[in-house]
Structures are given as structure tokens and as C-alpha cells.
């Protein structure tokens, strides 16, 4: 459950992320592909170089979807229902990958934070990203 403090932390941090969604998304995806090379199999048709148009576009899509979740913190499942159906029914992405991407997003946030990421803020973001991953995984049942 996201508390009001969690929601405030998430909105504050996400304001920085959403200022440059393409670049942030590219960095998070690049981290994902480097740390977890098996995730590249879902993007075999992409040019996986960080500067490629495909990675830039997909990185922006990822951030835009998370922005939609941030804008609907009280009903993330409804906000991400279509995206969850797409990944479960059409793309058939292994659900473990949502947690891996969430971790890479959190690392990217920490890397761009001015100074150390405070523990309470990091915890709020982790709770949010976990809730997003659980929302997406729920459509696999």
C-alpha cells in the first residue's frame, strides 16, 4: 500500500524523470540489456544501440507508461490494464522481466539524483515499481 508520503516522494522524483523521458528510458533499457542480457531476446528486431531510434522510442514508451501510473497512484491496475494485457497476451514477456526493469529504473533514478537517494524516497520508489510489476504480472493469470 502506498502511503501519502510514498505518493509525494514518487511524484517529486518522477517530475525529474518525466522532464526527459526519452533519455531516461534509454538509460534504463541500456542498464537492463547490460545487466540482464537475456532480456534482449524480446527486442531481436531492434537496433539495441543506445542512440538508435527504436531504443529511444521504446524508452520513451516505458517512461510514458510509468508516468500514467504516477498520475493514477490510487488505481494503478486500471491505469495499466491495456499495457498489462498487451504484455501478457500478445507479447508474452516473461513476468520476471518487469522486476528486472524496475530495478534498472531505480538504479537510474539513484544515478541521477543530486546527492544520495534518501532511504525513504528509495523505499517509496521501490514500492511503486513493485506495485507496477505486480499489476503487470496479475494479467498472466
From Swiss-Prot:
Matches recorded under InterPro entries: Globin (IPR000971), Globin-like_sf (IPR009050), Globin/Proto (IPR012292), Hemoglobin_a-typ (IPR002338), Hemoglobin_oxygen_transport (IPR050056), Hemoglobin_pi (IPR002339)
Position of the signal peptide: none
Subunit annotation: Heterotetramer of two alpha chains and two beta chains.
CDD domains tied to this protein: Hb-alpha-like
Protein family: Belongs to the globin family.
GO molecular function list: haptoglobin binding; heme binding; iron ion binding; organic acid binding; oxygen binding; oxygen carrier activity; peroxidase activity
Reported tissue expression: Red blood cells.
Gene3D superfamilies listed in its UniProt record: Globins (1.10.490.10)
Protein residues bound to heme b: 87
Membrane-spanning parts: none
Ranges where the Globin domain occurs: 1-141
Protein name as catalogued: Hemoglobin subunit alpha-1
Lineage: Eukaryota, Metazoa, Chordata, Craniata, Vertebrata
Keyword Signal: no
Alphabetical UniProt keywords: Heme, Iron, Metal-binding, Oxygen transport, Transport
A GO CC term assigned to this protein in UniProt: haptoglobin-hemoglobin complex
Binding site for O2: 58
